[in-house]
């Protein structure tokens, strides 16, 4: 991306978290190097970004989920971690450690199937997932945070999108040490 000398339209697809928190940094570096090059940033979930890159509708993608395809050059880019969280008023907010029994009792507000965040959550909850109560799936991180703030249930999102909410005390971070919520972010 940054080593290109040609100045032409660059069409980038990014997942929601990446677009909101990381893409602009990379885009600004490209704009410094290729002054005057027009850029389009479109937001999709991981599956959609992969499909659009494969169909040549996008020049590159920035994704949160795993992708495997022989026609794609998939480059690990950054590390990320999901955080479980709840309203400060939720009974789990006062618990130092969350165990599987707590995870099964909770009502969950999650990203939709096909998103990288949901992919990581589903992997982390292996063995529990069929028994979990997921009454609400939403496409946007802000909508999930607002629903959790209203104490409708608990959520799971990237630490990148929760940092400020934790700092203001609007959401409480939950610790479930037996669940691996780490993930890689990729360029394709």
Give residue spans per PLM region:
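Flexible hinge/capping segments at coil-to-helix
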Residues: 3-4, 69-109
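Central regulatory/effector-binding core of bacterial HTH transcription factors
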Residues: 7-70, 129, 138
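Short, well-ordered beta-strand segments
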Residues: 9-13, 61, 85, 109, ...
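Short beta-strand->loop
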Residues: 12-16, 107-113, 175
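Short loop/turn segments at beta->alpha junctions
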Residues: 45, 99, 139-140, 158
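Thr-Gly-centered strand-to-loop micro-motif
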Residues: 63, 87, 111-112, 134, ...
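Beta-alpha-beta core module
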Residues: 69-76, 80, 95-96, 142-188
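Secondary-structure junction motif
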Residues: 92-93, 100, 106-128, 159
């Amino acid at each position: 991306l940054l080593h290109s000398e040609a100045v032409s339209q660059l069409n980038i697809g990014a997942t929601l978290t990446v677009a909101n928190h990381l893409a602009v940094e990379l885009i600004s570096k490209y704009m410094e190097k290729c002054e005057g090059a027009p850029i389009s940033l479109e937001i999709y979930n991981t599956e959609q970004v992969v499909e659009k890159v494969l169909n040549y509708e996008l020049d590159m993608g920035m994704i949160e989920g795993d992708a495997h395809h022989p026609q794609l050059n998939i480059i690990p880019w950054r590390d990320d971690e999901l955080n479980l969280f709840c309203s400060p008023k939720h009974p789990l907010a006062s618990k130092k450690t969350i165990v599987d029994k707590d995870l099964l009792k909770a009502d969950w507000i999650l990203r939709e199937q096909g998103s990288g965040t949901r992919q990581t959550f589903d992997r982390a909850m292996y063995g529990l997932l069929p028994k979990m109560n997921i009454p609400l799936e939403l496409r946007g991180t802000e909508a999930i945070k607002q629903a959790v703030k209203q104490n409708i249930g608990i959520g799971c999102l990237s630490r990148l999108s929760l940092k400020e909410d934790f700092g203001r005390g609007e959401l409480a971070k939950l610790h479930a040490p037996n669940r691996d919520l780490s993930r890689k972010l990729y360029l394709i």
